[in-house]
A protein has these predicted regions:
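Ser/Thr-rich low-complexity repeats and stalk/linker segments
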Residues: 386-472
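Gly/Pro-rich hinge or "lid" segments in bacterial periplasmic/extracellular proteins
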Residues: 180-244, 254-255, 351-362, 476-485, ...
Length: 704
């Protein structure tokens, strides 16, 4: 007998299960909403980077970002940059600035100690350390010329054990940024010549700072150089949660990836061929930019590049979008202020506008010379007493018959020394038979200038005539005349835009203009002396995308009639030698503006390279790479440094932007995009708006 089941047997258990699950969900929601995630104290952060470790000193990090990362934690400055606000704030000292922005007075915080301090033998940070750090920079033997330049003319005085005064000759709005460099202890380099400080290995590989982390040790493993830092307790500011920070420095990214399971962060993540960051599994990517730009700097010391129309034409002919696409970048810029200006035609890629600007320059395509001459001949023949149409003739007979009006002639007038005769069938007209056999007045093969003269030998008019006996040559000449008419209509705007032609659409073959074919080689522009427009572009091997950009520039400018030779020195030292010598026409290079966008070092004429009979007079710190000189720009750069308010600053920046826009000393291309990767369980990472790669550690106190 079949069994029967009652539905009520299942309803009650199901309701109980549903009630239980709902309770769990509500309990979890309550827990999440009422729980605050509190950072755990301790732990070790291990970061991998690619590079080479050098002595760890704040004075000498400009060329080594890997060093700068470690130095930023071991050493602290009087001031620090806040990537969240973009402002300079107090760090080891409070800062007071006079109303005239010429006196900067710092007062060290209380209870500041160097890392070699012990309970029995504390080593406090004093004004003597401040004096030592900055007066050493001012010494003429100090090898970091860029850093030294920041303190030229600055008077530094000790006011007390904790107070130091910096007195400037001129107001300088951004001077506080110079006080972010890490302090060094007085006496740490006793016996070391100032010129050799960058080689002080004993201190450099066992540094003593006053930063949030102290140097613990360094070991060389099979895969990397490993530097260990330990948290150093300080009596001010936020407490850091991480007990240790370990930096593993690998020779290349492949070796780094082989150790990825032991890393919590990767400093700079490379990209694949599609431009995507190669993010390791279980890592989070944080992308950021720095106040940097990559540009093409025109060496305006070169007389060729003093032609503004030429520089403008090259800018208009540079396809920035194609460049950033090819190297997998994203951020196009048009100005040294890291801006893009889509409203100004001078920044828009337009090959026709580029040709137009170059048309007005001192450099001409060979076809332009022919075009101008042909247009002049056409204009000459279209007016006056002697109007010859067409200009080109296919004449194989013994004479070429021409006719004209007697309105401007008299009896006895001649054309090419051949007497004019009354026309037998046309009233008020003359006729002449010009020989082709070489006799007096003959019309010879090729170009002829006809001269109409009255009976007294006075010139009445002249005209051009081109003669050939070859039908193929005649067709080329006739095609040239057709193109001339089309060019005039294009110039006048009487044909639709898409049907217009420019000089770049023309090509010379056998001395005649024809329409350019895709298979035709590009012509190189020449000047009135017949010199070809050939420029040399200097760049570096690293980063490798610079060479790719250089090849693209060559490709972009070739149709404009500009030949580019690419110069990539094999060594860094050879490149720097050419850089100092200004041994280039165009330089593809990058510059960093740091936290304040102060462009003085890069565009003020005082930072041009000055050439004398002595090579020793050449400056390493001459950062005006375009050799650009402008009284207006100089004045604005000085005003920017002296500005009292943000409004005054922005007004001067806008005016400087306009001056550089008009002068085109460089073509600004893009601002690089970087990627930092860290494990997903690492909390508190906020990059903000860093000015240096190492600025990611300015929020390290929040990491856990």
């Amino acid at each position: 007998m079949p069994r029967t089941y009652s539905l009520s047997r299942y309803i009650l258990p199901a309701l109980l299960l549903l009630f239980f699950l709902s309770g769990l969900i509500l309990l979890r929601k309550f827990y999440v909403q009422n729980t605050i995630l509190v950072p755990a104290e301790g732990g070790t952060y291990i970061e991998g980077s690619v590079g080479q470790l050098q002595p760890l000193m704040p004075w000498f990090t400009v060329k080594n970002d890997v060093n700068r990362d470690i130095v930023s934690l071991v050493f602290s400055g009087l001031q620090k940059y806040n990537p969240s606000t973009g402002k300079i704030e107090d760090d080891l000292a409070t800062l007071t600035v006079s109303d005239n922005k010429k006196i900067f007075t710092i007062e060290l915080l209380e209870n500041l100690y160097w890392h070699d301090s012990t309970l029995e033998s504390p080593h406090p940070v004093t004004a003597d350390d401040v004096i030592y750090t900055f007066t050493t920079i001012q010494d003429e033997d100090f090898s970091n010329s860029l850093l030294r330049q920041n303190f030229l003319g600055v008077e530094i005085d000790k006011l007390s054990d904790r107070k130091v005064r910096f007195s400037l000759v001129e107001p300088y709005r951004f001077f506080a940024s110079n006080l972010t460099i890490g302090l060094l202890p007085d006496g740490a380099f006793e016996g070391v010549p100032i010129s050799k400080l960058d080689q002080a290995l004993d201190f450099g590989f066992n540094p003593i700072g006053a930063g949030p982390y102290k140097f613990k040790g360094m070991v060389q493993t099979e895969l990397s150089t490993e530097v260990t830092l330990e948290r150093f307790p300080r009596m001010f500011g936020d407490e850091f949660h991480l007990e240790r920070a370990i930096f593993r420095i690998f020779p290349d990214y492949t070796t780094l990836l082989s150790d990825i399971r032991n890393l919590d962060g990767v400093r700079l993540v490379p990209r694949n061929d599609q431009g995507d960051p190669i993010i390791p599994k279980n890592f989070t990517a944080a992308q950021y930019t720095l106040p940097q730009y990559v540009a093409l700097f025109f060496n305006v010391n070169n007389p060729v590049l003093q032609d503004l129309k030429l520089r403008l034409g090259l800018q208009l002919g540079t396809n920035k979008q194609a460049i950033v696409d090819s190297i997998n970048e994203k951020i196009i810029i048009d100005t040294p202020l890291l801006e893009i200006d889509t409203s100004d035609w001078r920044y828009q890629f337009d090959s026709n506008s580029a040709q137009g600007a170059l048309f007005s320059s001192d450099w001409h395509l060979p076809q332009k010379v022919r075009l101008q001459r042909a247009l002049e001949q056409r204009e000459v023949n279209a007016v006056g007493a002697l109007q010859v149409e067409p200009i080109a003739y296919l004449a194989t007979g013994a004479a070429l018959i021409l006719t004209g009006s007697t309105l401007d002639t008299d009896e006895g007038s001649t054309l090419n020394d051949v007497l004019l005769e009354p026309h037998p069938s046309m009233t008020g007209a003359w006729i002449v038979a010009l020989p082709t056999n070489g006799q007096t007045g003959s019309i010879l093969p090729g170009e002829n200038l006809l001269k109409l003269v009255d009976s007294k030998g006075n010139a009445i008019d002249s005209a051009y005539l081109w003669r050939t006996t070859n039908s193929k040559s005649f067709k080329r000449a006739a095609e040239e005349q057709r193109l001339l008419a089309h060019f005039i209509e294009s110039r006048d705007g009487s044909v639709p835009f898409e049907d217009r032609i420019t000089t770049a659409d023309l090509y010379i073959e056998d001395g005649m203009l024809r329409r350019r074919l895709s298979t035709d080689p590009y012509d190189i522009r020449v000047n009135d002396k017949g010199e070809k427009l050939s420029l040399r572009l200097l760049t570096t091997e690293n980063p490798p995308q610079y060479k790719e950009i250089a090849e693209l520039i060559k490709k972009h400018w070739e149709p404009l009639g500009v030949h580019i030779g690419i110069d990539v020195p094999k060594t860094r030292s050879k490149f720097e030698e050419k850089l100092i010598d200004r041994d280039y026409d165009i330089l593809l290079f990058g510059q960093s503006l740091l936290d304040n966008l102060d462009s003085y070092a890069y565009w003020h004429s005082s930072n041009m390279q000055q050439f004398t009979d002595k090579r020793s007079d050449l400056r390493i710190d001459a950062y005006n790479l375009s050799q650009y000189s402008s009284l207006e720009a100089d004045s604005l750069l000085e005003l920017i440094r002296k500005s009292d308010t943000d409004e005054e600053l922005q007004e001067s920046l806008d005016e400087l932007d306009e001056v550089l826009k008009q002068d085109v000393p460089a073509i600004f291309l893009y601002s690089p995009l970087y990627t930092f990767a860290y494990v997903k369980n690492l909390q508190g990472v906020e990059l903000g708006s860093p000015s240096l790669h190492s600025d990611r550690f300015l929020t390290l106190q929040r990491w856990f």
